[in-house]
């Protein structure tokens, strides 16, 4: 390490495993931005379920060890490399990706994954935009090609991606239904775009949804837990309806005939497959939503960096999401 190089606190993962492999260190060198890169002083970082899958080693993409998790940071520009002319020191920004990892006091990001954060949103809200809103937008607009007047059911609607999907769907003129497992979660879902909400902890909640939508069924289902819900989803769809799989924590057996009768589709989505150009399209639409006011992230549990392992435990095994989980720095 170069003499006099600035140090920072950062969470490091040296082996794949449970939350206990998240190690907070205080002697990590602050990255230096190269061409087309920006260094951000992190004020808040979003915690996403996918980060727990990556940490456990069960996700399709595995980072080289050791690494620092986290892609969704919000803070201020500390420094820029060459040709990063869109930003200057002190600019308020948020990211959709990082190079060095977001669970840290400073994060390095490619300049095309950094966006100006409007004054009307605070840093916690800025850290809640990245994966949730870009994923929800990709699922609804890019993959499902939703149209105004169609119906959408958002499973797990009280979490980060779910609330983002509700807000986007409502803004685009859809009939929005959501599910949540707590009274508080249901209330938040209704406050953020849903026309109706159902308690997925009730044994007969699928019957209630069927009664609500009638014979036509649901045009699009945004599915956060496909290994639990996929069979039920297929029974809820309209003719030509689509299940957009955003999340799954295991396997499930389905009867392909259930897709044949209604000529329905099951489509998987990951925001990591987005091209640079697609990210720019999504960002433009989402930044318009910030200005208009329909994009307003809801913040849930908040943790200091020292409690990152607890955050990872709770995002998977907690009793029910009520907004976006955030690390505060």
UniProtKB/Swiss-Prot annotation:
Swiss-Prot/TrEMBL GO biological process terms: xenobiotic catabolic process
PTM sites of type N-acetylalanine: 2
Coiled coil: none
Catalytic activity: 2 a quinone + NADPH + H(+) = 2 a 1,4-benzosemiquinone + NADP(+)
Keyword Cytoplasm: yes
Record-listed E.C. numbers: 1.6.5.5
Xref: PROSITE patterns: QOR_ZETA_CRYSTAL
InterPro entries attached to this UniProt entry: ADH-like_C, ADH-like_N, GroES-like_sf, NAD(P)-bd_dom_sf, PKS_ER, Quin_OxRdtase/zeta-crystal_CS, Zinc-ADH_QOR/CCCR
Chain positions recorded as NADP(+) binding sites: 53, 158-161, 181, 200, 229, 246-249, 269-271
Modified positions (Phosphoserine) in chain numbering: 248
Main location: cytoplasm
Residues bearing the modification N6-succinyllysine: 296
One Gene Ontology term of the molecular function aspect: zinc ion binding
SUPFAM superfamilies, A to Z: GroES-like, NAD(P)-binding Rossmann-fold domains
Residues the record lists as N6-acetyllysine modifications: 23
Keyword annotations: Acetylation, Cytoplasm, NADP, Oxidoreductase, Phosphoprotein, RNA-binding
Domain of life: Eukaryota
Subcellular location: Cytoplasm
One Gene Ontology CC term in the entry: cytosol
Job of this protein: Does not have alcohol dehydrogenase activity. Binds NADP and acts through a one-electron transfer process. Orthoquinones, such as 1,2-naphthoquinone or 9,10-phenanthrenequinone, are the best substrates (in vitro). May act in the detoxification of xenobiotics. Interacts with (AU)-rich elements (ARE) in the 3'-UTR of target mRNA species and enhances their stability. NADPH binding interferes with mRNA binding.
Quaternary state and interactors: Homotetramer.
Family assignment from sequence similarity: Belongs to the zinc-containing alcohol dehydrogenase family. Quinone oxidoreductase subfamily.
Official protein name in the record: Quinone oxidoreductase
Source organism of the structure: Pongo abelii
Gene from which the chain derives: CRYZ
């Amino acid at each position: 390490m170069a003499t006099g190089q600035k140090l920072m606190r950062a969470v490091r993962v040296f082996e794949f495993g449970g939350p206990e492999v998240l190690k907070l260190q205080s002697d990590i060198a602050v990255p230096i931005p190269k061409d087309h890169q920006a260094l951000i002083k992190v004020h808040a970082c979003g915690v996403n379920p996918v980060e727990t899958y990556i940490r456990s080693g069960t996700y399709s993409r595995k980072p080289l060890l050791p690494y620092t998790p986290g892609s969704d940071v919000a803070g201020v520009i500390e420094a820029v490399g060459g040709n990063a002319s869109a930003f200057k020191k002190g600019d308020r920004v948020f990211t959709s990706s990082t190079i060095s990892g977001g669970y840290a006091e400073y994060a390095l990001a490619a300049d095309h994954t950094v966006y100006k954060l409007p004054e009307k949103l605070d840093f916690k809200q800025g850290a809640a935009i990245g994966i949730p809103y870009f994923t929800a937008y990709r699922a609804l607009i890019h993959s499902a090609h939703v149209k105004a007047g169609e119906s959408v059911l958002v499973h797990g609607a009280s979490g980060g991606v779910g609330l983002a999907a509700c807000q986007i769907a409502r803004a685009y003129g859809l009939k929005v239904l959501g599910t949540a497992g707590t009274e508080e979660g249901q209330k938040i879902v209704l406050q953020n775009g849903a026309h109706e909400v159902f308690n997925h902890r009730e044994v007969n909640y699928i019957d209630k949804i069927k009664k609500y939508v009638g014979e036509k069924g649901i045009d699009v289902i945004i599915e956060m837990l496909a290994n639990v819900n996929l069979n039920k989803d297929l029974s809820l769809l309209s003719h030509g309806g689509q299940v957009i799989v955003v999340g799954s924590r295991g396997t499930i057996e389905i009867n392909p005939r259930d897709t044949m009768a209604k000529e329905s589709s099951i489509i998987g989505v990951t925001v990591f497959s987005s091209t640079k150009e697609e990210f720019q399209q999504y960002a433009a639409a989402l930044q318009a939503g910030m200005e208009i006011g329909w994009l307003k992230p809801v913040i849930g549990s908040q943790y200091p960096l020292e409690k990152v392992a607890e955050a990872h435990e709770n995002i998977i095994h907690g009793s029910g999401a009520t907004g976006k989980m955030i690390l505060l720095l």
